[in-house]
Amino acid sequence: MMAAIAAADCGHQVTIIEKNEKLGKKLFITGKGRCNITNDSDVENHLNHVISNPKFMYSAFYSFDSSRMIDFLEQEGLAVKTERGNRVFQQSDKSSDVLQTLQKALRRRNVTVRLH
């Protein structure tokens, strides 16, 4: 969804083809159902401690780090909070709020979604 939003922001017409019956279905199971959005630590920490193949993720993490993700969500109207271990969740603790925020962002950008 974020890649589609980024492409649409660059002026591209975008279609998401989703194999599941619902877009973002897997967001509901992250963070024990609360949707752990990101980890608010610096890129080097991610590359050295979180990722098993840092070279693969290097350019992606430096192009769009956790602070940019947090800024994006807040600009889209989603309040977030940082918990123990720098884990970032939405204030409501409802994964559905993250999904709704992303879906609204897709609609505002006229991204087409094709489901299962």
Show where each model-derived region lies:
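N-terminal Rossmann-like FAD-binding beta1-loop-alpha1 element of flavoenzymes
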Residues: 1-16
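Conserved N-terminal/central alpha/beta ligand/cofactor-binding core
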Residues: 19-112
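A conserved short coil-to-beta-strand element within the FAD-binding core of flavoproteins
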Residues: 115-116
